């Protein structure tokens, strides 16, 4: 469908990947890599840009280093919110329990709760902030309900603008997230982070940062790219223990 629109609009140069009955709709094309051998997504689309400049297929460097600026107004807004609840910036761990895609990208809430408890027990000055959209608020409440010392953990899911979420992540000591948009924000901000993968492929959508630690079990059934576990066990996420994630966090310091 996406290839049909530029054809109907009489756009002269229509670049894309072959397949899906696109013959004639695109006039500059590449073979679509198989799902079992996909390059990182950024490289996947940069290859089309390269094709426009080098239709003869010259291979050029497509390595990228994403960067993101923090809005001064958002930074001030978040600082004010943190001061209101007496949270010091140097002690913030941001945990992002959500993933819009579905449960096969979400590390279990009980694991997030256990990790939060470990951080609080091991670091008395630690403050945990749960971050996400409005749809993640219930996940945040589930996590908090399983944690003692709830004065050190707050649910900000659905309570920030996108700019404020970016600013908060930029202030964090460590970011722990699923494979989600907030993970990529953390990577672009070069924040120390742990990225947890389940049904998706960290080779295809990795956090592009040298400060990121990826945890992926690489089970025979993974990546399945399904919204629900076809086998009904969700071992790709459930078998990632909180202690494993805690160990990854400790290597970031």
Give the ranges of each region predicted by the language model.
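Catalytic machinery of carbohydrate-active enzymes
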Residues: 1-253
